[in-house]
Amino acid sequence: KLPALVSDNMVLQQATKVRLWGNATPNSSLKVRSSWDNTEYTAQVNDQGRWEIWVQTPSASFEKQQLTLENGQDKIVLHDLLIGEVWFGSGQSNMEMPLRGFWHCPIEGGNHAIATSGKYKNSIRYATIQRVGALEPKDYPVGGEWKVCDPRNAPEFGATAYFFATLLTEVLNVPVGIINCSWGGSTVEGWLPKDILLNYSDIDLSLAGNDEKIHPMLQPMIMYNGMLKPASKYTVRGFLWYQGESNV
């Protein structure tokens, strides 16, 4: 089993070691082979069935690649992978707002961006983590499948990160991957782990999970546990943070 972020169409950060992870038969071994250099890596699965491994990537390229994973019983081949620059976008509605806009809130130039998005089909990929809160850190994010950039998929791409990606791919001439992990109206407390929040006496941790008393977007730590932490294993170049209004 693999998280949705480790899937077909993903973009891997160039010229570094990237982390892959998942679940397999406990106390077994797993082999991973990369198409770009035909190197084989071996991961040991622990007694809880979890494994992770670091794989060396080459310089950025528009040439499509593959990763093959097998454990002697099952075989998974991940297709149409690109090597380039990967950025993680998070925050509240400014980061979440898609190219199609929200109700009565259109994106200036959004329709044109959607209609012409096909020109980035071989250079931009986009993954969106679903909005899920949790009281304890999760192993896998919900959602996160990588989408090719085209007029069918682009309407759901967060606009801020999309325009960042188009600029980046045009200036650097490399593939760009965006992971969008955002929740409109959220406060910064929701994106922080419990051990940090314990340092602040004005934050009431009992509000976490109490949907009857307070909206999930205003609850402490639940977005960190349900969205940010499980996606944080993915190797990226940098982090785009667009949040603040809910804390003013």
Question: Which residue stretches match the model-derived regions?
Answer:
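Cell-envelope and extracellular/periplasmic
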Residues: 1-248
